[in-house]
Amino acid sequence: MAGELEFEKPVVELREKISELKKFTQDSDMDLSSEITKLEARLERLEEDIYTNLKAWDRVQIARHPNRPTTLDYIEHLFTDFFECHGDRYFGDDEAIVGGIAKFRGLPVTVIGQQRGKDTKENIRRNFGMPHPEGYRKALRLMKQADKFNRPIICFIDTKGAYPGKAAEERGQSEAIAKNLFEMAGLSVPVISIVIGEGGSGGALALGVANRLLMLENSTYSVISPEGAAAILWKDSGLAKKAAETMKITAPDLKELDIIDHVIKEVRGGAHRDVEQQAAYIDEALKGELKSLLKLDKNELIQQRYNKYKSIGKISTENQYVGIK
């Protein structure tokens, strides 16, 4: 099977065996239906066991799957009347970030997201989903427009990180990201951000200062990649698997730490297995979050967002007196 991941090999091998038996029965007079039924039941149990007990590194692999749905895939399935806007009005148009105006269940919204490619040619065009400063400035332009016209903002996060090249630094990469963080904190409309793949460092956070931060079940959100963390901590990028477990970068871990608000269920095996069904899960989550946020006024939205990010990283400890009474 194309795009199989390392931990999926037992599932793939069993699927192939079932497929071979089915083909054999079609080409012969032998009835192997009983054996096929038993193998299919075994496959169901195997899939259930593997996909309900995924390790952090398994989720990293799923988040990086080449066929994983992108921002534009979800825009196609979730929104109507999408009109893409281009350019930052300073330098140019960065195709690593897409954004525009659309309708979600009839409600006018602004949609913004990082966009990866699905093949080499498109990845080069999209800079592998790593935005330049003009991408973040385009995103901010659309956010301010949404604020002016009272449209909720929905952001899709899917990037390894902001592009670290010389030209990007010369054009003010860090300033562009910092400006987004500052401006997003004060937006007077509901902001919902969803991590749909990899959420890497400040490049992800520049679309992540939201009233609600959601993650797909098999996405990741971290300050650095597992390979980068392993290289820094243990001088060996080969220990990325260990780093992934240690860093707590998966959706279940981050929900437990109160970094994110909600984990969106994924199709078994990953979102790439059924884009339409995955979009339906996201649709339901967005509907619920928007319903609650639209009840808040401008000041409540800003205060809620402020309180959310003020509390991140808070540590609670209980001190026990051990001295002389």
UniProtKB/Swiss-Prot annotation:
- The answer to whether keyword Transferase applies is yes
Q: What is the predominant subcellular site recorded for this chain? A: cytoplasm
Q: Subunit arrangement?
A: Acetyl-CoA carboxylase is a heterohexamer composed of biotin carboxyl carrier protein (AccB), biotin carboxylase (AccC) and two subunits each of ACCase subunit alpha (AccA) and ACCase subunit beta (AccD).
Q: In which pathway does it act?
A: Lipid metabolism; malonyl-CoA biosynthesis; malonyl-CoA from acetyl-CoA: step 1/1
Q: Which reaction does it catalyse?
A: N(6)-carboxybiotinyl-L-lysyl-[protein] + acetyl-CoA = N(6)-biotinyl-L-lysyl-[protein] + malonyl-CoA
Q: Which UniProt keywords apply?
A: ATP-binding, Cytoplasm, Fatty acid biosynthesis, Fatty acid metabolism, Lipid biosynthesis, Lipid metabolism, Nucleotide-binding, Transferase
Q: What is this protein called?
A: Acetyl-coenzyme A carboxylase carboxyl transferase subunit alpha
- Organism name: Bacillus licheniformis (strain ATCC 14580 / DSM 13 / JCM 2505 / CCUG 7422 / NBRC 12200 / NCIMB 9375 / NCTC 10341 / NRRL NRS-1264 / Gibson 46)
Question: What are the EC numbers?
Answer: 2.1.3.15
Described by its record, this protein's role is as follows: Component of the acetyl coenzyme A carboxylase (ACC) complex. First, biotin carboxylase catalyzes the carboxylation of biotin on its carrier protein (BCCP) and then the CO(2) group is transferred by the carboxyltransferase to acetyl-CoA to form malonyl-CoA.
- One GO BP annotation here? malonyl-CoA biosynthetic process
Its GO CC terms are: acetyl-CoA carboxylase complex
Where in the numbering of this chain does the CoA carboxyltransferase C-terminal domain appear? Answer: 38-292
In the record, the note on similarity to other proteins reads:
Belongs to the AccA family.
**Molecular function, one GO term:** acetyl-CoA carboxylase activity
Enumerate the subcellular locations listed in this protein's record, separating them with semicolons. Answer: Cytoplasm
| Gene3D superfamilies per record | 2-enoyl-CoA Hydratase, Chain A, domain 1
- Does the entry feature the keyword Calcium, yes or no? no
| Origin: domain of life | Bacteria
Q: Name the InterPro entries for this protein.
A: Acetyl_CoA_COase_a_su, ClpP/crotonase-like_dom_sf, COA_CT_C
